[in-house]
Amino acid sequence: LITGTTSGVGLNTLKPLISSGWKVVAINRSNKRAFEEASKSLSQNDLNKISFIEIDLSDLNEVRQGAQEISTKFRDLLKILICNAAVYKPRLKRPDRSVQGFENSMAVNHLGHFLLINLLIDDLINSDSQIKLNGKIISFTPRVTILGTVTANYLELGGKIPIPAPADLGNLAGFEKGFLSPISMANGKKFKPGKAY
């Protein structure tokens, strides 16, 4: 299972996973967009190995419903959870808020994934350790992988916008205060759009 396959790392991870023999569950806000983007680089045969499930990670109720659907359909098949989806809006003047009132990048990039992992962890742990990839049976330990990109990379959007956003988790006061308005950042300080936490 991989979140965020409409562009970048997530989209470019589909082909190697499928080529290695994996069947993939792709989680995105829009199945239509995810399918359209995947169709540009994958054959119909490859697309048939992807199950698209629509979940908006910023909405924790949708995450719960989506995790239930995943657990029902793929309980014994879930081997890897790749947390890749993210939002990054460095030009915002004030924070966007999720349905539950959390700062949106915190909701998508962290809280939604955290909840998804917690809801699916038992399925991962209890899945069969023997898998068949490209005709070979191998032993496999289920795993969770969390991806992130460096926003200071000048080749990426974040690196082209001169917004100082040094890493600063402080004492994690944002967690203590629940990220509800006016708190947006993990450190509990004033909103900085160039930070994804």
Task: Kindly give the residue locations of the regions a language model identified.
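Rossmann-fold NAD(P)H-dependent dehydrogenase/reductase core
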Residues: L1-Y197
